[in-house]
Amino acid sequence: MFRPTGGCSLAILGVFIFHIGEVQSQCWESSRCADLSSEDGILECIKACKMDLSAESPVFPGNGHLQPLSESIRKYVMTHFRWNKFGRRNNTGNDGSSGGYKREDISNYPVLNLFPSSDNQNAQGDNMEEEPMDRQENKRAYSMEHFRWGKPVGRKRRPIKVYPNGVEEESAESFPMELRRELSLELDYPEIDLDEDIEDNEVERALTKKNGNYRMHHFRWGSPPKDKRYGGFMTPERSQTPLMTLFKNAIIKNTHKKGL
């Protein structure tokens, strides 16, 4: 006869087997369930059956190479993927403490609550699984530096230089001395008196202060001479002779015609 503790453990094992059903047929065939005469042997058999039930895929009878992988091997293989966890679709919580629906159904058994759960193992597995994700993010950041949008590297545009006198210094240096003299002689500047120029400058300065517009007078197109506006075809040609000489010439021509 067994001791009372042994009878209690046998009753627990019977209830456990009743809930499991046909899936536990291979659990009886294991070497751990061979010795059921002592309480330690019964506990070893129950732990072995619990480990078999922790697998998320069903146990198929047949050869050993067709059976699913164990939990430790599955975790090792799945850490190499991006999703990093097996059966994450079935998770209901963000903290990772709650597993899929199959594991939740197994954990609801009152018999399994008597033994220590594998929460500590899952927490250690989560910590080990977070490290490959950090490495993958670091590798991705390193690889994106080689692209244009990862870290833009390019030439900076040169700023446009604005000279106060309106003439670039390089343009004057590009021409030799003789060509610069010829250009200065060929340019037609408007003939303006100094007094009028000073008065005009004062008026224009007052206007620029009021209106805020800047008028360029140092270019030819700033204030061209009147005789050259519109190409010269809008202004009448002026004769160099005065009016009195014109009248005299007209009278002399008329007298010559009458005399003839």
Curated annotation (Swiss-Prot):
List residues modified as Pyrrolidone carboxylic acid. 26
What are the entry keywords? Amidation, Cleavage on pair of basic residues, Endorphin, Glycoprotein, Hormone, Pyrrolidone carboxylic acid, Secreted, Signal
| Segment forming the signal sequence | 1-25
Q: Where is the composition biased (Polar residues)?
A: 116-125
Q: Summarize what the UniProt record says about post-translational modification.
A: Specific enzymatic cleavages at paired basic residues yield the different active peptides.
User: Predominant location of this chain?
Assistant: secreted
| GO biological process per UniProt | neuropeptide signaling pathway; regulation of corticosterone secretion
- Glycosylation is annotated at 90
Give the span(s) annotated as Disordered: 116-136
Residue numbers covered by the propeptide annotation in the UniProt entry: 104-138
Q: Does the keyword Flavoprotein apply?
A: no
Into which family does the record put it? Answer: Belongs to the POMC family.
Q: What is this protein called?
A: Pro-opiomelanocortin B
* UniProt organism field: Xenopus laevis (African clawed frog)
Q: Which gene encodes it?
A: pomc-b
